[in-house]
Amino acid sequence: MSEDRIPTAILGAPGYIGQHFARLLADHPSFDLPILLAGERSGGRRLEEVWQLADAPPAELAHARLERRTAAGLARAGVRVTFSALPSGTAGPIETELVRRGVSVFSNAADHRMDAAVPLLVPEVNADHLRLAGRRASGRGLLVTNPNCSAAGLVLALSPLVPLLRPRAIHVSTYQSLSGAGYPGVPSLAITDNVVPFIASEEEKIERESARILGTRSGRRIAPARFPLVAHCARVATREGHLEAVTVEAEQSPALGEIEDALRGFDPLAWRNLPTAPHPPIELRHESDRPQPLRDRWAGRPARARGMAVTVGRLRWAPPYLRMFVLSHNAVRGGAGGSVLNAELALDEGMIPGERGGRR
């Protein structure tokens, strides 16, 4: 264990998001090599035995054993930060117990996203919402969530446009990849030669979570964005990357050049040293046929931030309607990468109890 890095663990390490966590944390400058946690089915196996991602498992973790430990056991082992890839329903009580024992949790699960005192973060959009956590009781950890995978990319693309356009309403239709259902995902016979126009609870999550993230903080309360946001969701036969068709009905009528400048110039984390933050976080394409999942899902610079940028294209402005396509990597920006970036922000703000490093 490195003495200048924070001890960590991954909850649900064998899963699709868990493996992306392992990839992102294997050589992280602030977080130490994680303890890999699994359930009864995978416990005791090596990470390489359960690996499903296209790239090989990171060498630092390939031979690591998947362990079964309790929250108390993790706290006794000195773990300060956990990254949760547990399924919703399972995650809630485990995350609560970890926080009670002083272990901070950065969660990809839905269980606590709408809790009043729990930040629901996309750092480029609402970093100030981290203050919802306030001053915690002595010995308690920090709990931070990232949003639904489609909402994560959507709000990032909308953030520079909301003050410029003052939306009356926003409509989004999503074309979501198979990996959004986890591994092994959707049965092949259900999706081959097909589009499935329903994903359980997805539309409600996008609408509710986006309104909260784009809302305004006053003390420890969030006033949700006041404009309606309406979502339609479909599952399509792409492997990774969620594509979204977005229409904004605007109150203001800036020039198209102002809209493009707002998207290109948006980089609110540029002054922070957050290793997983992409610069810029929005990549604007002018080709008639972009963005595409196959070509654009790994957008993001520097190399550690691959998959963390959103790509915006087919920008069409006929006031009061702005139309565009938005693409994001559902497992990186919309999953493990979002949680890691949240942890980097919390560390930079000095909000991880027992941290090694941080600004204060």
Give the positions of each predicted feature:
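Charged docking surfaces used in two-component/phosphorelay signaling
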Residues: 179-360
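N-terminal Rossmann-like NAD(P) cofactor-binding subdomain of oxidoreductases
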Residues: 1-191, 195-198, 222, 228, ...
